[in-house]
Amino acid sequence: IFAAWPQLYAVSFSGFYLAMAAVLLALILRPVGFKYRSKRDSSQWRAAWDWALFVGGFVPALIFGVAMGNVLQGVPFRIQPDMQIFYEGGFFGLLNPFALLCGLVSVAMLVMHGAAWLVLKTDGLVASRARNWGIRAALATVVLYAVAGVLLWNVVDGYRITSALVTTGPSNPLFKTVQSGVAGTWFANYAAHPWTQLAPAAG
């Protein structure tokens, strides 16, 4: 994706740098946690590494959802005439209410997915606990997903390209005009292409 659209690479890595660094550190923490959790016969030691494993799984799931929420709202950047891109936001600006809601949707969906996998691969107490958490995560996913959809329809401003799409030449964002400031714009695609409604309906 980044090779096809280098502008996307430039904006995302400059704007989401701290967020991506947090994801990277969390992903590094997971294999370390699995390796060192059983190194000592101590309940406190194991509990500490259990929390490390939790952080290593929770942070990437949350931040990936937060990133998607910010993409839906629009990322604050500007493009110079010489095609230089400047990000004008900050890390804490990414943690806005709608983006955090999208982060929670991501966490709930991944917990549901992980719980379903454990139910299939284990039995006994582990499978029973995974089933209980999977049901809770599924209910949370449905509720949070619905709330996010209502906000996208009524509150969050969408974006729509109003200029002609030239598919026979190189991409130049300076030649495009975008309409924003109208809530529900993201749902216009469902009206233009009704078959796309199958995607959210199928989950």
Regions of interest found by a model, annotated:
Residues 1-36:
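Membrane helical hairpin/interfacial module
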Residues 36-203:
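Long, contiguous internal "core" modules enriched in hydrophobic/ aromatic residues
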